[in-house]
Amino acid sequence: MKFKFSIIIFIVFFHQSIIFANHKVYVIHGFAGFPLQMEKIVQGLNHSGYLTENYTYPSFSEDLDSVGRDLYRKVKYENFDTVSFVTHSMGGLVVRSMYQYMKPTGHFPFIYRVVMLAPPNKGTELADFQFNHVSKTFFGPNVENMKTNYDSYVNRLPFPTCEVGVIAGIRGKKPWFNPFLKEDNDGTVTIGSAIMGTEKDVAIINSMHILMPEKEKAIKLIIAFMKTGCFVKNKNLK
């Protein structure tokens, strides 16, 4: 029995060693975000032994389709054996946009895992409001891309085919917090909009949207999912 257990441990360790021998994690900020906002996540992953890149892109001026294409080209060019992604907000849509350019027969690194923080996977009602009432020139092309209607850009994007973990934020559905969002939300994205329905695991934490990348609980959940493919047993962390 002990011999079999030792064999299992060896196989698991050997498998993980192969994955992490040439494995890179791309950390991607959201709309109007910046690399410094994601630095605590980068540091947490680095301390856990992961090779990372704090990836940035022009979220105001370049549309999601172009950003996804640029990410695809970069990942393909760098040619790591295995890659993973940790994203905040619209960064999750950047990864989904990247999937449009991945061909089944084309050479591309194996995508191991993706962790999305507060992703507007089904759009956000704030985009509906802002697109209708504020100049597109001010916000750029991606506000329209994140509208909630069924045929909007975000709702036509492919879902990742790898293991995905979604971390959603909650601050309650009090009218004074955000009158435009009727469901439980983080001030920008509702829980229902964050969840795709295809992810492997979901965790909910008490956090405002913009502050989630700096939350210690979020970082611990990210590392847990990257290591094991799941979050902690108690997934509702206040």
Give a label for each model feature.
Residues K4-H15:
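Sec-dependent N-terminal signal peptides
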Residues A32-G33, G92, N121-K122, I170-K173, ...:
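Short, solvent-exposed loop/turn segments at secondary-structure junctions
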Residues E39, S66-V67, G123-Q130, P175-F180, ...:
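Short aromatic-enriched loop/helix-cap "lid" or pocket-rim segments at secondary-structure transitions
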Residues K40-Y50:
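A short, Lys/Arg-enriched amphipathic alpha-helix followed by its capping loop at the start of a domain
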Residues H23-H29, T52-P58, E62-T161:
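Serine-dependent carboxylesterase/thioesterase catalytic core
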Residues P158-K238:
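C-terminal catalytic-base region of ester-bond hydrolases, centering on the histidine
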Residues F34-K40:
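The serine-hydrolase catalytic nucleophile loop
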Residues I19-A21:
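Boundary at the C-terminal end of the N-terminal hydrophobic targeting segment
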